[in-house]
Design a protein with these regions (language model features):
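A short alpha-helical element within helix-turn-helix/winged-helix DNA-binding domains
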Residues: 35-46, 60
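Residue cluster at the C-terminal edge of the helix-turn-helix DNA-binding motif
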Residues: 45, 62-65, 106
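Extreme N-terminal segment that seeds HTH/winged-HTH DNA-binding domains in transcriptional regulators
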Residues: 1-35, 41, 90-120
């Protein structure tokens, strides 16, 4: 599992971690039933608090990406893409909120921002 976090980002570390794990599930890097590192091991590997990994794992479980087995840890869930579509849309919306905020800071109008999105899409 390859995870890179940016401590200077405005996005909280637990959200960055959740997005990274979610993306690896969606692209097939992490497979259904695969065990994730323990919260403590992952926290140590990433030099973050256990609270960060705990929140990320719990959020991902709530969203249907992971499930927990008492005394064994967290595992990749059998992801139903229709079921998680709402979660993915919310994630996109959150990222676009950040982009809109940045655009407003430099007085970029909605049309120009839309053009950038069209170009990237």
């Amino acid at each position: 599992m390859n995870i890179f976090l940016n401590a200077s980002s405005a996005v909280p570390l637990y959200e960055q971690l959740s997005e990274s794990i979610k993306n690896q599930i969606l692209d097939g890097t992490l497979k259904r039933g695969q065990a994730l590192p323990s919260m403590r091991a992952l926290a140590a590997a990433l030099s973050v608090s256990v609270i960060t990994t705990k929140r990320s794992y719990e959020d991902l479980a709530r969203e249907g990406f992971l499930y927990s087995v008492p005394t064994q840890g967290y595992f990749v869930a059998d992801v139903n893409f229709k079921k998680i579509e709402k979660s993915i849309k919310k994630s996109i919306e959150e990222k676009l909120k950040g982009a809109c905020y940045q655009a407003k800071k430099i007085n970029l109008n909605a049309e120009d921002l839309s053009e950038i999105i069209r170009r990237l899409y």
